[in-house]
Regions:
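Metallo-beta-lactamase
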Residues: 85-159
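Active-site metal-binding motif and surrounding structural segment of the metallo-beta-lactamase
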Residues: 15-16, 26-76
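Active-site-proximal loop/helix segments of hydrolase catalytic cores
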Residues: 153, 157-195
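Conserved beta-strand hairpin/beta-sheet module of binuclear metal-dependent hydrolase folds
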Residues: 1-43, 167-182
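Generic beta-sheet signal
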Residues: 78-80, 180
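Active-site environment of divalent metal-dependent phosphoester hydrolases
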Residues: 27, 53-59, 84-86, 163-165, ...
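Second-shell loop/turn segments in exported
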Residues: 18-24, 48, 191-195
């Protein structure tokens, strides 16, 4: 299991690392980065990728990178078309009602022990730290759009309206790696957790 509800992935490239889906909160994402650095060395973050517009996939971004590095162009942030609109609509406009419903779904008001809450189904549970957002610098706008990120070739495929209103998947040619976001999972979490 991970440090948070979602999983953060770190991809080692030619000069540094790309962080995919930096968790729910900055504090938890920073702990994840510290664990990585302790075991793999202090490679710089050169890119962040948001697979989709749900808060558990971007909320910890400021625990991973400094916004000044993004503004200077030192770090690029990639996201699918429609990301900002979907993130705002879901997490600000509908956020209060979704948060209340999530309490029933996750049982986060239960005491965390063997007879109470032992997890949220998808992962441990949502962290309670600072939710952050840094706007994307690079938008993936079409299927088959290729981007070279830190020496690796990413072949993107948009999947809007699949698991989230704005979502994407990709293939990294050099690593023969497929990233399927939350479109391929062991759960049907958007079906049984209607919020």
């Amino acid at each position: 299991r991970n440090l948070d509800l979602s999983n953060m992935t770190i991809i080692e490239g030619k000069e540094g690392i790309t962080v995919v889906d930096p968790l729910v909160s900055a504090e938890t994402a920073k702990v994840g980065m510290d664990l990585y650095y302790k075991n793999r060395g202090n490679k710089p973050v050169v890119a962040v990728i948001y697979t989709h517009s749900h808060v558990d996939h971007y909320g910890g971004v400021r625990g991973v990178v400094d916004e000044a590095d993004v503004k200077s162009g030192k770090v690029k942030v990639y996201a699918p078309a429609g990301f900002m609109e979907a993130a705002v609509a879901e997490n600000i406009m509908a956020g209060n009602v979704m948060s209340r419903r999530a309490s029933y779904m996750y049982g986060n008001l239960l005491k965390p022990d063997a007879k109470g809450q032992v997890g949220a189904g998808l992962g441990t549970t949502t962290s309670a730290g600072t939710v952050t957002l840094i706007a994307p610098t690079n938008i993936i706008e079409k299927d088959g759009q290729k981007e070279v990120i830190d020496g690796l070739t990413y072949d993107f495929m948009l999947a809007p309206g699949s698991e989230a209103p704005s979502e994407m998947l990709w293939y990294i040619e050099e690593k023969k790696l497929i990233e399927s976001a939350e479109d391929v999972t062991h759960t049907l979490h958007n079906t049984y957790s209607l919020r």
